[in-house]
Amino acid sequence: MAAKDVKFGNDARVKMLRGVNVLADAVKVTLGPKGRNVVLDKSFGAPTITKDGVSVAREIELEDKFENMGAQMVKEVASKANDAAGDGTTTATVLAQAIIAEGLKAVAAGMNPMDLKRGIDKAVVAAVEELKTLSVPCSDSKAIAQVGTISANSDETVGKLIAEAMDKVGKEGVITVEDGTGLEDELDVVEGMQFDRGYLSPYFINKPETGAVELESPFILLADKKVSNIREMLPVLEAVAKAGKPLVIIAEDVEGEALATLVVNTMRGIVKVAAVKAPGFGDRRKAMLQDIATLTGGTVISEEIGMELEKATLEDLGQAKRVVINKDTTTIIDGVGEEGAIQGRVAQIRKQIEEATSDYDREKLQERVAKLAGGVAVIKVGAATEVEMKEKKARVDDALHATRAAVEEGVVAGGGVALVRVAAKLAGLTAQNEDQNVGIKVALRAMEAPLRQIVSNAGEEPSVVANNVKAGEGNYGYNAATEEYGNMIDFGILDPTKVTRSALQYAASVAGLMITTECMVTDLPKSDAADLGAAGGMGG
């Protein structure tokens, strides 16, 4: 086992604070409307330019092991805030740095670290409750657009696009961000349910100009099996032909003789048919087929439940107003499924989302909810160069997370004002002893840090502005973009309550651990001499 380097007490804490400061100073220059860019070197390709706090934090590794431990712990704050609310990473880092710096000063002055931590925790619990009372629901498009604009670093077009997307696909709808092809940002909305499987044969195409299959009011056959024998399908095909409607077959696969016969029938105009593979794999495919069945009012023909394809009737088939199939995707528009059944299915999937353990599963389940409940919107980000595209895409992603958080828990006044008001409200808070009271003061003083940093990045004097804001009340604050004071809500400067709350909770959690650190252990660096000795046997 390698020899260890151990540091105790103040020696350890000073080193740790140095690491915290290096990381936090790099991250906090990005805060606010006048935040600066950070350029990150990449081992290949052009450097990345970003104003996203967590992207900066992730890049930082320090040479000194003890300093690096401090930096990595604050990196955890940014990552956790990002995972919980998708934004507020810089705010969380600034808060953590402020609490750690003030807390370690108090420890150096002889306060009991455990009592300090208890005081900080008490202040944060009270602050979270206070934030909830200040929170205003965020339901209209205007407020959603404002939240998106602030989070995308004051880019109004992004805010408007996100609000429009939420308008089209509902609060539950899936909104994805992709690379655009032009210079402008675009919004692409897919109504109905879309999945990424295309036609099994190009001979099904009936709209050559678009290279797609478009079927009006078709029957939809859902089969959880491979179909290769046409005899199994004859009864259904005959019934559909009599009804004079087209047929869409969604099965695990349609191959060989069965596919050839369907193609011949289509080309001769006997019955309009199109076949596609079912989306997903394994259990997920079964679940998605069931989703489509619920949406279209059909039944999945599955041998697991004793149903045979030969015995399927028109009653077992789903229906929709229109189905559009191209090379890679299938879209079912206006399925005739009962609203009650669809809502029941959505509720069932939501329950699974709550119980999901992996992010991947959760994401897939949320996509299924969106496809059943609303639709899918794609924001295509336009930019002149790839470097700009990456930077802009990261901002749009942040803005999207922020607006979702705002819809979930409401909004508070932005620009660091909400935390200043909370701190003022809790000024009279006391605990069991003097050291705990100091802990409360440390947390309350740190709550001013985001406002001060926003002002500092805008090139103004933080103390002057902070005092002016504290002299006001309610939503009165400082708009760093226009350098004027006024009502932050009227200025359209809003922060999602969830983002502010998460930032404060995670910052206090990690800061509390660091303040109560008494010893740090790391591997001793191997001496250069030992390295040279190891390489000595390599004669030329």
Curated annotation (Swiss-Prot):
It catalyses: ATP + H2O + a folded polypeptide = ADP + phosphate + an unfolded polypeptide. Its EC number is 5.6.1.7. Its main location: cytoplasm. ATP binds at residues 30-33, 51, 87-91, 415, 479-481, 495. It is found in: Cytoplasm. GO terms for molecular function: ATP binding; ATP-dependent protein folding chaperone; isomerase activity. GO terms for biological process: protein refolding. Together with its co-chaperonin GroES, plays an essential role in assisting protein folding. The GroEL-GroES system forms a nano-cage that allows encapsulation of the non-native substrate proteins and provides a physical environment optimized to promote and accelerate protein folding. The keyword Isomerase applies. Keywords: ATP-binding, Chaperone, Cytoplasm, Isomerase, Nucleotide-binding. This is Chaperonin GroEL. It comes from Raoultella ornithinolytica. It is an enzyme of class 5 (isomerase). GO terms for cellular component: cytoplasm. It holds the Pfam family Cpn60_TCP1. Belongs to the chaperonin (HSP60) family. InterPro entries: Chaperonin_Cpn60_CS (IPR018370), Cpn60/GroEL (IPR001844), Cpn60/GroEL/TCP-1 (IPR002423), GroEL-like_apical_dom_sf (IPR027409), GROEL-like_equatorial_sf (IPR027413), TCP-1-like_intermed_sf (IPR027410).
